[in-house]
Regions:
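Short pre-catalytic strand/loop immediately N-terminal to key active-site residues, enriched for Gly-Thr
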Residues: 1-3, 147-149
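Conserved SAM-binding loop
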Residues: 150-151, 160
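Conserved, helical-rich catalytic subdomain that frames metal- and/or nucleotide-binding sites
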Residues: 45, 49-148, 163-169, 173-175
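DPxDG-like acidic metal-binding loop motif
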Residues: 2-28, 42
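Glycine-rich beta-strand-to-loop/alpha-helix junction loops that act as flexible
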Residues: 4-5, 152-156
Length: 176
């Protein structure tokens, strides 16, 4: 849920490109990265992006308004493959999808609360069914004042999005 091996792969591609003076463009590194993993192109590009397809079709976006995140791993890890297998059997009508266009508008306006309201992770329900602690952790972060609490990737890390450093630090102090 936090990039893991794909982040390592992206960093390795960038590092080797520089070390060996290969002079590959970012687009070329993204194409190579896709052969390693679907989210490697995103981690090669960096910044805030809209990802489509399997994650290889990237559109760079306006940076997010200043915000603070509190990361929390309330339970043991989950198998990404297992989560996606379960997701594939989930009815599309039951999924809370991100509101991508509203998110892009919020980014352009620098509107953090609107950005938070537009965000969703379609894998949350599947992962929470396997690890109920995730749902409790999300509720706890919201109780502690998060503008939005979400799970990263397929889990098991969750995060709270806060509008100030003070609010984030207070929430961190309030975690069990």
């Amino acid at each position: 849920g936090m990039g893991g091996g794909s982040a390592d792969a992206g960093a390795a591609l960038i590092g080797l490109n520089r070390l060996w003076n290969l002079n590959f463009s970012t687009a070329e590194l993204e194409r190579i990265g896709l052969t390693v993993g679907a989210d490697v192109p995103f981690l090669v590009r960096g910044g805030l992006c809209r990802a489509e397809g399997v994650g290889e079709q990237l559109t760079s976006l306006t940076p997010a308004p200043k915000c603070w995140l509190v990361l929390w791993q309330p339970c043991d890890g989950l198998s990404t493959g297992e989560i996606f297998t379960a997701f594939d059997t989930t009815s599309a009508e039951t999924l809370a999808r991100p509101q991508t266009l509203r998110a892009q508008e919020a980014l352009l306006a620098g509107d953090l609360p609107a950005l938070a309201a537009s965000m969703n992770n379609v894998l949350e329900g599947v992962s929470a069914a396997k690890r109920p602690q995730l749902e409790r952790a999300l509720h706890r972060l919201e109780e502690l004042g998060a503008l939005r609490a979400m799970m990263t990737g397929s889990g098991s890390v969750v995060y709270g999005l806060f509008g100030s450093e003070g609010a984030a630090n207070a929430a961190l102090s309030g975690l069990d």
